[in-house]
């Protein structure tokens, strides 16, 4: 996935500034959970074929485990990565995505400047929780004979942004490549569980954010590094959006 960006990107992709040993400690645990994102599927024939009941059950489980908001969508082909890191072609293998938002915490987000250590730590805490939640859910479904895989920040075969939009969990905002949810704003991290279990899908949401972001401009005004656009949307890779710099 990094190969198309050249040799430097391939070298540097593994180096990331976590700002504090606290954040790095959580990263180690996140990476340790990667082998448990997938596994053998039980041979028993699964009996869970009702999409409506399955969706209610899987969402209830996600909330019990700690997800803030959960949505479901079918995975379009363009939401899958085309290749694995080693260059091998990736063939899409599941139909549905269960997309979960993890709240990074209002008080923590409100107290962070972006230059302090907590900005990285709150991200890693949310990613760690997400990996645990989706990992448990995937393991349970596989034990029922249902093929499933958790897609985390440490190892994901799907792009999270398109499935988050399709699952009705928010809209793109002026901030750029960041999804804003109507209840928790942009203070979220995502984790995805892909599966072939029959599910009832949700619809994409429109809560008026495009019109609001066209006139508000507060995020652009307050951005300390002036990376948020003051202008109108542009076309980027075939998509209309506000492009951060």
How would you label these PLM feature ranges?
Residues 1-69:
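Iron-sulfur (Fe-S) cluster-binding modules
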């Amino acid at each position: 996935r990094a190969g198309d960006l050249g040799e430097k990107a391939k070298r540097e992709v593994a180096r990331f500034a976590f700002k504090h040993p606290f954040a790095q400690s959580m990263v180690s645990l996140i990476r340790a959970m990667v082998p448990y994102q997938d596994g053998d599927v039980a041979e028993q024939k699964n009996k869970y074929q009702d999409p409506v009941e399955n969706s209610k059950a899987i969402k209830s489980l996600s909330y019990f485990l700690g997800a803030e908001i959960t949505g479901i969508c079918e995975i379009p082909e363009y939401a899958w990565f085309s290749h694995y890191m080693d260059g091998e072609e990736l063939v899409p293998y599941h139909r549905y995505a269960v997309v979960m938002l993890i709240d990074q915490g209002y008080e923590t987000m409100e107290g962070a400047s972006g230059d302090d250590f907590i900005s990285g730590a709150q991200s890693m805490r949310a990613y760690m929780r997400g990996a645990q939640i989706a990992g448990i859910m995937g393991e349970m479904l596989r034990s029922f004979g249902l093929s499933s895989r958790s897609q985390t920040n440490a190892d994901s075969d799907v792009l999270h942004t398109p499935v988050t939009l399709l699952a009705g969990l928010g809209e793109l905002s002026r901030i750029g490549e960041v999804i804003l949810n109507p209840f928790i704003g942009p203070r979220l991290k995502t984790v995805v569980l892909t599966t072939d279990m029959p599910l009832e899908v949700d619809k994409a949401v429109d809560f008026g954010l495009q019109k609001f972001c066209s006139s508000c401009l507060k995020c652009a005004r307050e951005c300390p590094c002036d990376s948020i656009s003051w202008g109108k949307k542009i076309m980027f890779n075939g998509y209309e959006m506000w492009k951060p710099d």
